[in-house]
Amino acid sequence: LWYGLLGAASSLAAYFFAQYQAGWRLGLPLFGVGADADPVYIRATTMALAAIVFSQIGEVWNCRTETASVFSVGLFSNRQINIGIIFEICLIVFITLFPPFQDVFHTSPLSLTDYGFLCLLPPLILFVEEIRKAIVRKRHNQVNHSVTPQAEER
C-alpha cells in the first residue's frame, strides 16, 4: 500500500511536470485530455509511465529490508536487482526512443530534463522510506527498552 502510494504520487508529479513544461498552469485546462494524438498529452502520459519505472527503482532498493536501513545491507549488493534495474531502464528508453515501440506503447521521446526529473525519484523514495524505517526502529526500541517495575520482578 505504501509503495503504491509513493508510485502513484511520483506518476502524478511526472504527468503534471510534463504539462507544466508545455505551458500549463494551475487553473488552466490540461493539454490534450481526451485527444490521444496531442503531443503534450502523449509526452505527459509517457512521463507518468517512466515515473512508475523509476519509482520502482527506489522501491526495490527499500523493500530489501523491512525495518533496517537499506545501507546496512548495501544499496548495490544484490546482483539480480542491479540487473533488473538496468533492464527496466533500458526497456523504458527503448519504448520511448524508437518509433516502432512508440507506436505500440503510444509513447514519445523524453528530453534530458525529463530524465533529470525521473532520476530524482529513486533517491527521493529511498529517503522517504529510510525516514519511515528510522521511525519504526525508534518506536520499536522505545517499546523494548521501557521496562516496568512489575516486569523486573518476574
Give the ranges of each region predicted by the language model:
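C-terminal transmembrane helices and immediately adjacent loops/tails
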Residues: L1-R154
